[in-house]
């Protein structure tokens, strides 16, 4: 399954606010979009778990294959699989750039990374899924075009609050990863346990 590139409003109307996908916010209705959406019926356990999984996939801009790989990796690590899964996704370079305010959304952040505008420890890294770790320094490439894009993005950051595991110096356009993100700083409202259950069926 490929990465979603369609209208974001339809997705957030169905799944609720997805801060990584878009800044747009719509009131979530009691029924899904579409002409048959108002028909009420009891949702199955599968449907509930699927919705939580879809929240994660669309918010972080992952393909189904990428998400499956993250779940498998989380299961192999010690600790709560659900929380480790969220940490793996939050520590991706495209998400770190987004959380630092260098891009308004994760898709915009991914584009910055893909186009070689972002450096990690003074080396250009063009892989959005690159796993950042404590001690990593995130900077903008020493190029006027790169700096201009990020300076403009900083005027309208996607999320107002900088997570406790990150620090950012606007004057230098430099961020630092100080720690692994804690669960309370994950901006997406999601039940990660249901996602683990979905892939354990």
UniProtKB/Swiss-Prot annotation:
InterPro entries: Ribosomal_uS4 (IPR022801), Ribosomal_uS4_bac-type (IPR005709), Ribosomal_uS4_CS (IPR018079), Ribosomal_uS4_N (IPR001912), S4_RNA-bd (IPR002942), S4_RNA-bd_sf (IPR036986). The keyword RNA-binding applies. One of its GO terms (cellular component) is small ribosomal subunit. It is found in: Plastid, Cyanelle. Its main location: plastid. Residues 91-153 form the S4 RNA-binding domain. The keyword Ribosomal protein applies. GO terms for molecular function: rRNA binding; structural constituent of ribosome. SUPFAM superfamilies: Alpha-L RNA-binding motif. One of its GO terms (biological process) is ribosomal small subunit biogenesis. Pfam families: Ribosomal_S4, S4. CDD domains: S4 (cd00165). Keywords: Cyanelle, Plastid, Ribonucleoprotein, Ribosomal protein, RNA-binding, rRNA-binding. Part of the 30S ribosomal subunit. Contacts protein S5. The interaction surface between S4 and S5 is involved in control of translational fidelity. One of the primary rRNA binding proteins, it binds directly to 16S rRNA where it nucleates assembly of the body of the 30S subunit. With S5 and S12 plays an important role in translational accuracy. Belongs to the universal ribosomal protein uS4 family. This is Small ribosomal subunit protein uS4c.
């Amino acid at each position: 399954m490929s990465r979603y590139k369609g209208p974001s409003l339809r997705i957030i109307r169905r799944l609720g606010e997805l801060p990584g996908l878009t800044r747009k916010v719509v009131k979530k209705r009691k029924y899904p979009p579409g002409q048959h959406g108002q028909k009420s019926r009891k949702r199955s356990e599968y449907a509930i778990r699927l919705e939580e999984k879809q929240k994660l996939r669309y918010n972080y801009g992952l393909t189904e294959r990428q998400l499956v790989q993250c779940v498998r990796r989380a299961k192999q690590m010690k600790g709560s699989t659900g929380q480790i899964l969220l940490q793996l996704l939050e520590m991706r370079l495209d998400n770190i750039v987004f959380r630092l305010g260098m891009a308004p959304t994760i898709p915009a952040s991914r584009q910055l990374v893909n186009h070689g505008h972002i450096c990690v420890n003074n080396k250009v890294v063009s892989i959005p899924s690159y796993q950042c770790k404590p001690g990593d320094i995130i900077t903008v490439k020493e190029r006027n075009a790169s700096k201009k894009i990020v300076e403009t993005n900083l005027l309208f950051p996607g999320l107002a609050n900088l997570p406790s595991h990150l620090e950012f110096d606007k004057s230098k356009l430099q961020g630092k990863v100080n720690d692994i993100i804690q669960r309370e700083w994950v901006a997406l409202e999601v039940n990660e346990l249901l996602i683990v259950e979905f892939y354990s069926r």
